């Protein structure tokens, strides 16, 4: 009897205590910050990581073959300077108060920037369509604006790198003086030209279905507009009719404005205000091109169909 009573007492002692709050681990604030509530978007308005990844992908693509994409264009542009200065005479002829080599060098620098920005922008989506890898651009969680920014940013980067390479090469050429008079003009017109051709390149890559289409735009639109934009001459030497046509060419304002940054003089107009008007006009033109490219990209024309 005593043993049974003792066992009953022990059972009563080991019974769980009820009514007391169970111990719980305190919530971790870091976990709450890492995992948002259900239904709340994980990414913000801009997918910064995705945008940066796309940009670096495009930069690494042309940097892997930098001899072809950066240094070869720099050498080709340098050959223009050598050939034209030898043909025209290095020290006998002056334009805008400087020798011919100093006059033509800034135009060649920004021309190289624009042409290579176009080459990079016109290849990305077209290469994806031809090689069957266009899905790599369309499937990631990137908006149309982010896709456009990544492509244009990489194209501008290539243009700037080519411009720096050409600048260094031409600075070493005898008779060339590339002293900066208006740094803001060099930066603004250089970037506006690179952005303009990058946007045109993206539009071309959307429209083109094969590399022949891309080459046609390069040979029949970009190259003529570049070479007939006052790179090797001032438009004041042209007949009034052709001067009016040249002033309708946006490449003319890029090249003459960029040259103004080095020489302090330009054939855009007789005053610095004319250069400012050209700078604002390029800004408006690029804004219109950016909106147009975005709208075409958003429709998925020739990309998703």
Label every model-predicted segment.
Residues 2-7:
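Extreme N-terminal basic, low-complexity initiation segments
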